[in-house]
């Protein structure tokens, strides 16, 4: 059985239900503490590979 296609008006009305209020959109977010911020070093693995390659070249 084929699913019935939703009308454009139905989609628009559905989106309007969940629109945030003006106040909640403009409300400033609190700045998190330094301990709460999680950081990831995405390039660490790439640097490791690079240094291992460099070291392997120099030990020959």
Swiss-Prot record:
InterPro entries for this protein = NINE (IPR007986)
Q: Which domain of life is it from?
A: Viruses
Pfam families per record:
NinE
State the family it belongs to: Belongs to the ninE family.
Q: What is this protein called?
A: Protein ninE
Q: Which gene encodes it?
A: ninE
């Amino acid at each position: 059985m084929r699913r019935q296609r939703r009308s454009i008006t139905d989609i628009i009305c559905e989106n309007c239900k969940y629109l945030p209020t003006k106040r909640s959109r403009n409300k400033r977010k609190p700045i998190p503490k330094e301990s709460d911020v999680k950081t990831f070093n995405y390039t660490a693995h790439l640097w490791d590979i690079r240094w291992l390659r460099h070291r392997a070249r120099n030990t020959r």
